Design a protein with these regions (language model features):
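Donor-nucleotide binding loops and adjacent catalytic segments primarily
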Residues: 196-269
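A nucleotide-sugar donor-handling region in carbohydrate enzymes
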Residues: 148-208, 234
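C-terminal amphipathic helix plus adjacent low-complexity
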Residues: 336-404
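Acidic donor-binding loop of glycosyltransferase active sites
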Residues: 268-277
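Conserved N-terminal ligand/cofactor-binding loop architecture of enzyme catalytic domains
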Residues: 21-97
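A short alpha->beta transition loop at the rim of the catalytic pocket in nucleotide-sugar-dependent
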Residues: 271, 289-291
Length: 404
């Protein structure tokens, strides 16, 4: 059995995990292949898990703090890499020793150089491939020139890698992997054009973490248009409760939801989707062929996504919400000609087969035989012993609770 490890993250937005799932769906179609999606932050223990949990609150309430972090680390990645290498070494090596993979794929930037350092330090010959999860603005921590391959979902991301001095021979242009649930829905159902003869179905999203001006946008749409609005709040339960209370006067014209696993249904139904410029959600919507209005983006890795969407005609952009109503009226003029033009451009852009094509490429790089993992010494043996003791105590306590 050939084993593939995908290094992802469960708490830094949902995009990385969605990409990992899209790859796993395709890779497991191959005979004698198993795929394990691993949260890379777990290799750093509880500290790593807690650190990854900060992403949601920061992107929700502290975008400028996130921008400051980007600006500092983009100039010097070495301190971050050294810290990650230090905290991940023992658990990563333990995982390799216990369950060695025939291929490692990373869809998260934080771990690439640290993991490759560890593989090199122990002379472990496991192919390591990075799949970029961003479209235009690529943080240098994504790019380690020693990787066997770096998969670039756009021309812009490939150019960014080249600007870091990466050898073109290890770069490969690919599409953006989208989960099968979206591609199959789009294959089977043609998105209906809107002609103004019924209520406008609007979908509001703000990423898996539920950040953004959802209340303001919902009010603008419901006050100014014959519209029904569905709001997806993601994991932000506080926002969901607040919107349910403050928008209740609109009755059945408003539907407020939390984190959804059936986003494709809402996208296929929507006449227009309004969202942040998150690459994963944006391209899932493009796959479903729902016209987009992008109202902003996270500083750093999403900064150029509005320009990217405009360049390829995938969306209208509105960074100032005072312009949202005029923009919407323009898109709805002449039997919604503006919305239908976006649909046309999206059809020309989208690809249903990117994930399967990437999987085919990855399968060609899987080792035929299990790699040799040498014996190693823990760099922090006392810490690992303490962790093991804590696990045993936790397990024992849990069993006692179940008995009672």
């Amino acid at each position: 059995m050939k084993k593939i490890m995908i290094i992802s993250s469960t708490k830094t937005g949902y995009g990385h995990q969605s990409i990992a799932n899209a790859l796993k769906e395709q890779l497991t179609q191959y005979q004698d292949v198993t795929v394990d999606i691993v949260d890379g932050f777990l290799f750093a223990g509880r500290l790593g898990v807690k650190a990854s949990g900060i992403y949601g609150p920061i992107t929700r309430w502290g975008e400028q703090l996130w921008k400051l972090n980007w600006d500092i680390t983009v100039k010097n990645t070495e301190p971050s890499i050294q810290m990650i290498s230090m905290f991940t070494h023992d658990r990563f090596m333990q995982r390799l020793k216990n369950d060695p993979p025939n291929l490692i794929i990373s869809v998260h930037p934080f771990f690439n150089t640290s993991m490759i350092n560890i593989l090199r330090d122990h002379n472990i010959k496991i192919p390591y491939i990075t799949l970029l999860a961003d479209l235009v603005d690529i943080h240098p921590i994504w790019v380690d020139k020693r990787a066997d391959c770096i998969l670039c979902p756009t021309d812009e991301s490939m150019n960014a890698c080249l600007s870091f001095g990466t050898d073109r021979s290890i770069l490969r242009r690919c599409g953006f992997p989208i989960r099968r649930i979206f591609t199959e829905a789009a294959r089977q159902t043609e998105h209906k054009l809107y002609n103004g003869e019924r209520s406008l179905e609007c979908l509001l999203m703000s990423g898996g973490e539920g950040s953004g001006n959802l209340k303001v946008i919902a009010n603008l749409l419901l006050k100014n248009f014959n519209a029904n609005v569905t709001v997806i709040c993601g994991r932000n339960l506080r926002m969901k409760a607040m919107l349910e209370k403050q928008l209740s006067r609109y009755g059945n014209r408003i539907c407020i939801l939390g984190f959804c696993t059936n986003m494709h249904n809402y996208m296929m139904k929507a006449d227009v989707t309004i969202m942040r410029g998150s690459p994963n959600s944006m391209l899932e919507a493009v796959t479903c062929n729902t016209p987009l209005i992008i109202t902003g983006s996270l500083p750093g890795q999403e900064a150029s996504n509005l320009e990217y969407a405009e360049k390829y005609g995938l969306a209208a952009t509105c960074s100032n919400l005072k312009q949202l109503v005029p923009l919407m009226k323009t898109l709805l003029d002449n039997n919604a000609a503006g919305l239908n033009e976006i649909i046309k451009k999206q059809k020309a852009y989208r690809s249903f087969d990117s994930a399967s094509e990437i999987a085919k490429f990855l399968i060609d790089h899987v080792l035929e035989t299990p790699p040799n993992i040498p014996d190693f010494e823990y760099r922090y043996p006392l810490y690992m012993q303490a962790v093991e003791l804590y696990r045993k105590l936790e397990t024992s306590t849990s069993r006692k609770r179940k008995r009672h």
